Structures are given as structure tokens and as C-alpha cells.
């Protein structure tokens, strides 16, 4: 079994679509092995998204991710990383395929509802950024 990291972003929490996202996750065959609602500080968001530090959108991304609560998740299933990327859909909801979370619930490129690890290396950094081993069941 493979694990991946996911975030339900502040825009989705604000719009009260968390339950819809969780339902789509479970319908997609994922087991939720870790979940917590947190509010990131700007510093925590900067640490989490450090790989984008030199990108022009870094400041806006960190401000967005720290504007309100998020739901941090660890998901488990065979091929979890690729399957979660597929269920999320394209970054821009306008380009996402029908049946994906971003097509169904995303608003814009920034307010696109969810984040997910893009590789095993990313997941191995992102999961322990939010969860310790005792919190994963």
C-alpha cells in the first residue's frame, strides 16, 4: 500500500464543501489514515511550499494557504499518489476532466480545492510535516 498527502484548501473549507471532498476520496477507494483541521501560519505555509520559493506565485500561495483553516490528510491505497493526482484533476478547474474534484468543486487556479503530493519524494516530506507516526492509523 502506498500513502500520499492531501490538503483540502482554505477555499473549500470556507465554502463548506469538505464533506463532498471527503466523500469523493472515499468513493475513489482511498483509506483516510490521518486527518486534522489546522490553520497554517504564513511561516508554516512558507516551510511547506519551500520548493516553490523562487517562483513568482510563492508569496500569494503562502498568503492564500494561511488565510483560513485547512484539512490535512494522509490517504492510503495501491498507487495512491497517481490515483490521488487523477482524482484531483488538472490544476486549472476549467481544464479538469469531469468527475474530478477540481472540475466539480474548484473555482480558479488558486482556489482549486485540494493539494496533493506529486511524487513519493514529496509525500515523504509532506506527510511528516503535518503528522507524526502515532497519528496515522
UniProtKB/Swiss-Prot annotation:
Broad class of where this protein is predominantly found: cytoplasm
One function term, GO molecular function aspect: metal ion binding
Cofactor: Mg(2+)
GO cellular component terms listed in the entry, alphabetical order: cytoplasm
Record keyword NADP present: no
EC number: 2.7.4.6
Name of the molecule in the record: Nucleoside diphosphate kinase
Organism: Citrifermentans bemidjiense (strain ATCC BAA-1014 / DSM 16622 / JCM 12645 / Bem)
